[in-house]
Structures are given as C-alpha cells and as structure tokens.
C-alpha cells in the first residue's frame, strides 16, 4: 500500500516530466519553423536551379542538420558562417556540422588529475 507522501511525489515527478517535455517542444519550435522553410526551398526553389553548391553536405542539408543538432541560435549561427563561405574564393569540399559538445562535461571534475598526485607527495 502506497503512502500519500509517495503518491504525491510520483505525481510531482510526472508533472515535472511533462512540463519538461512541453518546454523542450516550445524551445524546438523556432528551429522546426526554420527547417520547414528550408524544406520548402529544397522542394520548390532548388529543383528550378542548376546544382551549384560546392560543399558536401549542401548548404541546405547543413542548415537542417545544424538546427537539429545545435538548436536555433547556434544552428543559425553555424548556417550563416557556412553561407558566408559560399563564395568564389573558397574552395568548398567536405564541411560537416561540428559535433555537439556537452557543456557540463568539463565541470564534472574540478581539478586536473595531477593535483591529487601532488598532494600525496
């Protein structure tokens, strides 16, 4: 038999979970909107033009992938930098979207490994 305290904690955890997923959906909305317009471009405008992109993946593929990987702000910034490279003086070639880095990965350990070794000597 569950206690009232246990049930209220479970309800709170479920509420937090659904609120968190709702917040993620709201945060993803601008990126999804941009991806929608990029897909419109790829479907209706791009086929009418000669293929001229000098990069792999193409600039529109890069934009969609960067928005999905990094979110709206950083994805848009990466896309603008990529489009700025699209000029006759840049050779083009393979230019993938950079991998997403965990921003908290460095904060898990406060000290370099050798500090503990120095303390023991």
UniProtKB/Swiss-Prot annotation:
It is a peripheral membrane protein. One of its GO terms (cellular component) is plasma membrane. Keywords: Cell membrane, Membrane. It comes from the Bacteria. InterPro entries: Membr_insert_effic_factor_YidD (IPR002696). The keyword Transcription does not apply. It is found in: Cell membrane. The keyword Membrane applies. Its main location: membrane. Could be involved in insertion of integral membrane proteins into the membrane. Belongs to the UPF0161 family. This is Putative membrane protein insertion efficiency factor. It comes from Rhodococcus opacus (strain B4). The lineage of its organism: Bacteria, Bacillati, Actinomycetota, Actinomycetes, Mycobacteriales.
């Amino acid at each position: 038999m569950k206690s009232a305290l246990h049930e209220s904690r479970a309800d709170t955890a479920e509420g937090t979970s659904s609120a968190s997923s709702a917040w993620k959906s709201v945060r993803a909305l601008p990126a999804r909107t941009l991806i929608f317009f990029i897909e419109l471009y790829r479907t209706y405008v791009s086929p009418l033009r000669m293929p001229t992109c000098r990069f792999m993946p193409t600039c529109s593929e890069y934009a969609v992938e960067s928005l999905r990987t990094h979110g709206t702000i950083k994805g848009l910034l990466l896309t603008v930098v990529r489009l700025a490279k699209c000029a006759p003086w840049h050779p083009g070639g393979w230019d993938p979207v950079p991998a997403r880095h965990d921003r908290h990965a460095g904060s898990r350990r406060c000290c370099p490994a050798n500090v503990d070794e120095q303390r023991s000597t």
